[in-house]
Regions:
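N-terminal segments that mediate ammonia production and transfer
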Residues: 1-198
Length: 198
């Protein structure tokens, strides 16, 4: 049996990125194509993208991308969100099934605004309030992980090669004025199991 390191390079690393200097939005398929040329620099254990300007219709709201282990955890997290934010829209993040990306958690997206009364009572500015809420979810709700929480941007990450992750998340259906991509070992992606436990 081959062991890790004989099949993949555990310390693989690949990066790519670009920005539209004139602000025009570029289809996400371009960043997927760009990082695919770095395939041999990745190890298949983690890939991700960040797109900026991808949610123009919700550009003034925070876009939370969240992994869940179960629907029970999702419901618990949504109660927390309802207490601390006005939820403008929520949905599963659209994916394209592929045999190259497996064992995915539940993946949801929320467009939210912090409740003004909560910000006032916290005596924090808006960004600090949002950051603390994200940290609270990630540290205190077991089985939930907020992996993206900015305005008019989104992170898309998974266990796999970057080009497969881009296909999985259907990045060809997004447009943004800036894109980054990486391929590497997923050192900070709780919520996604490489192998399903039986």
């Amino acid at each position: 049996m081959l062991k890790e390191g004989q099949v993949r390079i555990p310390a693989g690393c690949a990066i790519s990125g670009f920005i539209s200097r004139d602000g025009n939005r570029i289809n996400g398929s371009e960043i997927v194509k760009s990082i695919s040329y770095m395939h041999d620099r990745s190890n298949g254990l983690g890939g991700g993208f960040a797109g900026y300007g991808i949610y123009p219709e919700y550009k003034n709201h925070y876009a939370f991308h969240i992994f869940y282990d179960s629907n029970e955890v999702r419901e618990k997290t949504e109660k927390f969100l309802d207490r601390h934010f006005d939820v403008i829209n929520l949905s599963r993040i659209p994916i394209r099934r592929t045999p190259k990306i497996t064992n995915e958690p539940l993946i949801w997206r929320y467009f939210v605004d912090p409740r003004p009364t909560k910000i006032a009572s916290s005596q924090l500015d808006e960004k600090e309030y949002v950051a603390r809420c994200v940290i609270k979810i990630n540290n205190e709700i077991n089985g939930a992980y907020v992996f993206s929480s900015g305005k008019n941007m989104g992170v898309f990450k998974a266990v796999g090669y970057p080009e497969d992750v881009g296909d999985f998340y259907r990045l060809d259906e997004y447009e943004g004025y800036a894109w980054t991509a990486h391929g590497r070992y997923p050192t900070n992606t709780p919520g996604w199991r490489r192998f399903r436990r039986e």
